[in-house]
Regions:
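Conserved acidic/glycine
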Residues: 1-56, 242, 247, 252-325
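Glycine-rich ThDP/TPP pyrophosphate-binding loop and its adjacent helix/strand module
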Residues: 116-310
Length: 325
């Protein structure tokens, strides 16, 4: 881990957080009540990733052009960290024709063919798709890698287990990532499984499994690096579970009554100020650097917001575009 790596990780985490914070603000404008998905400038539901940034930046730091990611209904952090264009992504979230899917997909169905990025609101759906990417890479004889991301709730789905088994049998270059934020919507882990680490399940499929803490972004970086290197070398799949924290609701408008006293502890678990403090203590960052990095991120986000707001809204005729059957 070099100083440059550390700065890059921190900057990307801040960039993602400022993006999500601005969406939070824009999404709630003109929405009364907060969960009215038909009101405001941004249609549909909204699932934001605040608190889970280290998972995305730590993994994506090892990916290169041509590697593939399949993400979840909470996809923004992985999309941005993987190089998806912020302007086109935000235009899609606003439902504009300049968006990644011409405004037809929305925030849960982002698709970027150039960067091999996709996501879905269907739980565990991305795992089989990532295996398909990995199989294609293997047959072509490239060193490309696929990354499949899901939450801990999806680890009890059949598609999760089928994908791990298939990837191990076929020795596919895929890294399975579980973001464990302790809640499958409002269901705590203890109500759905008796195990304390999904990483332990990897052994049953003959692959390495490791669990790391989200608040240690450098630990995420190291674990992801080992898994990606293994896949590129033709040594097969790995499983990484990242114990993370969801700072905001499952969706915007979620009252989070089920979290109880945990809500009072979230600020001290925020990974961005934790990492900033560590970098300041080690002399890598200063308070002025922190302010400058945030201002730079805010400027990029503002430019993307203005691009989205000034982009056309689809017409009725646009509904027939890209319909083939």
């Amino acid at each position: 881990m070099t100083t440059l790596n550390q700065l890059d990780l921190y900057k990307e985490m801040v960039r993602i957080r400022q993006f999500e914070g601005r969406i939070l603000q824009e999404y709630h404008a003109d929405k009364t009540p907060a969960w009215d998905i038909g009101a405001g400038l941004i249609p549909g539901e909204m699932h934001l990733s605040a608190g889970q940034e280290p998972a995305a930046v730590g993994v994506c730091a090892h990916l290169k052009k041509g590697d593939a990611i399949t993400a979840t209904h909470r996809p923004h952090h992985f999309a941005l960290a993987h190089g998806v264009d912020m302007k086109a992504m935000l235009a899609e979230i606003y439902g504009r024709t300049t968006g990644l899917c011409q405004g037809k997909g929305g925030h849960m169905h982002l698709f970027d063919a150039e960067n091999h990025f996709s996501c879905s609101g269907i739980i565990a759906q991305g795992y089989p798709v990532a295996c398909g990417h990995a199989l294609a890479f293997k047959r072509r004889g490239t060193d490309q890698v696929a990354v499949a991301v899901t939450g801990e709730g999806a680890a009890n789905q059949g598609a999760f287990h089928e994908s791990l088994n298939l990837a191990a049998v076929w020795n596919l270059p895929v890294v399975f990532v579980i973001e464990d934020n302790d809640w499958a919507i409002s269901v705590p882990r203890s109500h759905s499984t008796s195990n304390t680490s999904n990483a332990d399940r990897a052994a049953g499929y003959g692959m390495p499994g490791v669990r790391v803490e989200n608040n240690d972004v450098e630990a995420v970086f190291e674990a992801a690096g080992a898994a990606v290197d293994r896949a590129r070398a033709g040594e097969g799949p790995s499983l990484i579970e990242i114990h993370t924290v969801r700072l905001w609701g499952h969706f915007e408008g979620d009252a989070q009554a089920y979290r109880g006293a945990e809500l009072d502890t979230l600020d001290v678990r925020d990974p961005i100020p934790i990492y900033a403090a560590a970098l300041i203590d080690s002399g890598i960052l200063s308070d002025d650097d922190v302010a400058s990095i945030q201002a730079e991120a805010d400027a990029e986000v503002e430019e993307a917001v203005q691009f989205a707001l000034n982009s056309p809204v689809p017409t009725a005729d646009d509904a027939l575009l890209h319909v083939f059957a």
